[in-house]
């Protein structure tokens, strides 16, 4: 059975890169009828942010990436927080000492800094401490770390399923710390121990971890365990080809949710980061992605995460994928957040229908449609100028509108066209000032539709205010 996992660190906002890697882990597990695990790597206590774990899990659920095992759903391989598994890592670090694959190192932080200055990195000097002496010093409580003892000379072969075989000279592989002096493991030890104990068969992660993989391969060899298959995905890039980061891009999934991006659209867009459908389609469901997914269709070129392209895709989902009822339902929290209410479900649906071609995110709807829900809406400079130009015509139009009995789009269109013809002016010379009076904008859906939706009483009230 295929078992995949993601192991995010709760050190800040849920990252779009985490979602990208999670998506491919999820798809590969589902494609093969396997299991997808979420494990929280919270051993870096200095960078730990309270509440970050809950936000990561909430973001995965928002994106529709359900997992079979994890800290909040449990499972047969728990606990799923590394901070709750410390005795395990200590046990396996001791095992490596016994097997001759690790050693205790007692340098102080100051000594390590001096070694780095002189040698460019740790030089393995504690390898030469006799094991009996090291054990005695540890028993006395002398602070120390446990380091991997990389076999030298020699080479380590890493097979990456996307890139082929890479051979590393062991002289280039450092004796990394496996267990810190506070008893917490480093990423390398915890990662390998957990992947083995949780039965992970396929490790799908970002390409920045490729350089760590020879260390992990050596650890599997040291324990006598079979290594999983490794797939290192290309990193998401900014349009200028630099690695995506919060300095240049919006990387927080919470930001995308708050801005009114649809989880389906964001998920669809992330699928296209390094993957293409056999038929070249850009819009597809998660299920269609899973059915079409093969590693042969994953490209290693740096995929560009372009916010404008995502906005375009989000707009396509709003206009073409979701039903009118779904869009109306999803804009409600954004209307409430903007302090707006709606008189009926039918009114809201019609407002969304009229505005649908004009907004690309859910948050834009209350911004662009404010005049449909409140009398407190802004008036643009252009609209104000157009209103002032058209005041004489609007004063003559007002009594006609007030006595108009049939308040439908067709009847109102006939009235306005007839009025313009009677005055010998183009329809726009009447329609644009009226549009400005009713909405505060010149960029709106059709005027007749807006008149009908606002209703006679509200439309006349706004026109009276403009003429006052």
Swiss-Prot record:
Record-level GO cellular component terms: cytosol
InterPro entries tied to this protein: aa-tRNA-synth_I_cd-bd, aa-tRNA-synth_I_codon-bd_sub2, aa-tRNA-synth_I_CS, aa_tRNA-synth_I_cd-bd_sf, Glu-tRNA-ligase_bac/mito, Glu-tRNA-synth_I_codon-bd_sub1, Glu/Gln-tRNA-synth, Glu/Gln-tRNA-synth_Ib_cat-dom
Signal peptide: none
GO BP term (any one): glutamyl-tRNA aminoacylation
Reactions catalysed according to its record: tRNA(Glu) + L-glutamate + ATP = L-glutamyl-tRNA(Glu) + AMP + diphosphate
NCBIfam families linked to this entry: gltX_bact
Coiled coil: none
Function field: Catalyzes the attachment of glutamate to tRNA(Glu) in a two-step reaction: glutamate is first activated by ATP to form Glu-AMP and then transferred to the acceptor end of tRNA(Glu).
Keywords of the record: Aminoacyl-tRNA synthetase, ATP-binding, Cytoplasm, Ligase, Nucleotide-binding, Protein biosynthesis
E.C. designation(s): 6.1.1.17
Motif mapping: 'HIGH' region: 8-18
Similarity comment text for this entry: Belongs to the class-I aminoacyl-tRNA synthetase family. Glutamate--tRNA ligase type 1 subfamily.
Motif interval(s): 'KMSKS' region: 243-247
Keyword Transmembrane helix: no
PROSITE patterns per UniProt: AA_TRNA_LIGASE_I
Gene from which this protein is expressed: gltX
Enzyme class: ligase
Subcellular location: Cytoplasm
Annotated source species: Thermus thermophilus (strain ATCC BAA-163 / DSM 7039 / HB27)
Protein's UniProt name: Glutamate--tRNA ligase
Quaternary context: Monomer.
Binding-site residues, ATP: 246
GO molecular function: ATP binding; glutamate-tRNA ligase activity; tRNA binding; zinc ion binding
């Amino acid at each position: 059975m295929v078992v995949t996992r993601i192991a995010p660190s709760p050190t800040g906002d849920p990252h779009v890169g985490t979602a990208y890697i999670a998506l491919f882990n999820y798809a590969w597990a589902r494609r093969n009828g396997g299991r997808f695990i979420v494990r929280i790597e919270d051993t870096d206590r200095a960078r730990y942010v309270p509440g970050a774990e809950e936000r990561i899990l909430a973001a995965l659920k928002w994106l529709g990436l359900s997992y079979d095992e994890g800290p909040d759903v449990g499972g047969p391989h728990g606990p799923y927080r590394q901070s709750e598994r410390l005795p395990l890592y200590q046990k396996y670090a001791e095992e490596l000492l016994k097997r001759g694959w690790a050693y205790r190192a007692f340098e102080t932080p100051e000594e390590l800094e001096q070694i780095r200055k002189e040698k460019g990195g740790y030089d393995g000097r504690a390898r030469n401490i006799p094991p009996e002496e090291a054990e005695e010093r540890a028993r006395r409580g002398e602070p120390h770390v446990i380091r991997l003892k990389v076999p030298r000379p020699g080479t380590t072969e890493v097979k990456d399923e996307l890139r082929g075989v890479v051979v590393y000279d062991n002289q280039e592989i450092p004796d990394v710390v496996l267990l810190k002096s506070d008893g917490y493991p480093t990423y390398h030890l915890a990662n390998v121990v957990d992947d083995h104990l949780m039965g992970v068969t396929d490790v799908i992660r970002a390409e920045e971890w490729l350089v760590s993989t020879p260390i992990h391969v050596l650890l599997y060899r040291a324990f006598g365990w079979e290594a999983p298959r490794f797939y290192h995905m290309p990193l998401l890039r900014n349009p200028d080809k630099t690695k995506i980061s919060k300095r240049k891009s919006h990387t927080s999934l919470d930001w995308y949710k708050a801005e009114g991006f649809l989880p389906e659209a964001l998920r669809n867009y992330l699928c296209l980061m390094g993957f293409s459908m056999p038929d070249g389609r850009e819009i597809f469901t998660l299920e269609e992605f899973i059915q079409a997914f093969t590693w042969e269709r994953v490209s290693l070129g740096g995929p560009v995460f372009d916010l404008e392209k995502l906005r375009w895709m989000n707009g396509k989902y709003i206009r073409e994928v979701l039903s009118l009822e779904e869009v109306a339902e999803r804009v409600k929290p954004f209307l409430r957040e903007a302090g707006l209410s709606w008189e009926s479900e039918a009114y809201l649906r019609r407002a969304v229908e009229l505005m649908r071609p004009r907004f690309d995110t859910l948050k834009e709807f209350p911004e662009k449609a404010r005049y449909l829900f409140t009398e407190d809406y802004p008036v643009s400079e252009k609209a104000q100028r157009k209103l002032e130009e058209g005041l004489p015509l609007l004063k003559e139009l007002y009594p006609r509108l007030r006595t108009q009995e049939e308040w439908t789009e067709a009847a109102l269109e006939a009235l306005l066209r007839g009025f313009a013809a009677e005055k010998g002016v183009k329809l726009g010379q009447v329609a644009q000032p009226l549009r400005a009076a009713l909405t505060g904008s010149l960029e709106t859906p059709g005027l007749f539709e807006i008149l009908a939706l606002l209703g006679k009483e509200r439309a006349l009230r706004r026109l009276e205010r403009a003429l006052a």
